[in-house]
Amino acid sequence: ALDWVDVVSALSADPKATSELAQSISSYPKSSPGYFADTQKKVKDFVEAGQLGIFAKAYWGHPAYKLPPEANLMAVAHYLEALAWQRDVSRLHAIFGGKNPHPHFLVGGVPCPIDLDSDSAINSARLSTVQGIITQMREFVDQVYVPDTLAIASFYKDWGAQGEGVGNFLCYGDLPEKGIADPSSYLFPRGAILNRDLSTIHEVDLHAIDEIKEYVAHSWYDYSSGKESGLHPYEGETEFNYDGPTPPYEQLDVEKSYSWLKSPRWKGNVMEVGPLARVLMMYANGHEQTQELVNYTLQTLNVPVEALFSTLGRTAARTLETKIVADNLQTWQDNLVGNIKSGDTRTFNEVLWEPSSWPKKAQGAGFMEAPRGGLAHWIVIEDEKIANYQAVVPSTWNAGPRDAEGQAGPYEAALKGHQMVDPQQPVEILRTIHSFDPCIA
């Protein structure tokens, strides 16, 4: 958010005018002059004390910032509130997973038992807490996140023509209505879109050896079959071979190896994963709410459908996806309560819990649509021991280097043609890279 919002500019805003602006785009009840004056004072105290904290090391005053002071103050106030809101929402993870971050898990399900009469299980009080969080989440998304995104985006419509990337999108699929074995019931559909063509969704098989492959032609790894070859994760190898310059360094030779990431490809195609891929997949599948939200966004901003394939579109997709998920949370909560009332309190499937019940050799893939994109782990088990384990994470897809064919990954492709006002303050580059929500853990 702060790639588009000038925090220091908010100090010159008129809180009353900011309140009028906020009330013109939303019915959020906190949008009073006093609310924005308090935020302004808080930011002023940060600046005067030289303790900018989360606002430090930014490029405030950069000419690429286009928002008027009042819009900046509104966005900063809501940004600070979103931090607190995010903390409350993460309590859902703790309720169902024991803690956050890094919730507990159980092979075949979740670790939290359901017992309405127990103080240490999922009970009526915890279900009531969940309902309260869902209600709060939907209100914040509807009254703050969505209208703020549209308001801020209206000042940056030129970014609807920058940062496209590769134009290919991949989803593993997630959030099943009828169980993981039925991909047709996923809220996030599984599939691939090539060359921006939303009329055709290609089927994706995570287990097919000839579909997903990782390449290391420009990575600091070696394959026994040679650096030009590609391997499916079931056959994957992780052999380090760092031949780059001695750190620290300022420049890498991109004609050689230059990354610790591999280069995943689907049927040889560079693919983008993440919120934009999911929104496009839902849109192409005819998901009614997604189509309404996307069309409304395009009409409100008065930008063409091509603007979806951009830094602006990628950033907006995260907002629209949040709205879709927040609304569906209520349905999932109602289904959970309905199951409990009918006596269904199962939380995991123990059929394959005992290793002695496994075949002598087995392999499988666990997948999900993580916030930043498709995430999958592939495992090969022999004699009850792990023989091979490979993970292809979202930022590997998006941030991976060029492959043996010279195809740039989504990050590199999206940066093509970017112009910077000041190379020492590359806020333009940050906007596009941050639109992918990068994370290498």
Predicted features, each with a name:
Residues 377, 382:
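A translation/RNA-centric and nucleic-acid-associated enzymatic feature enriched
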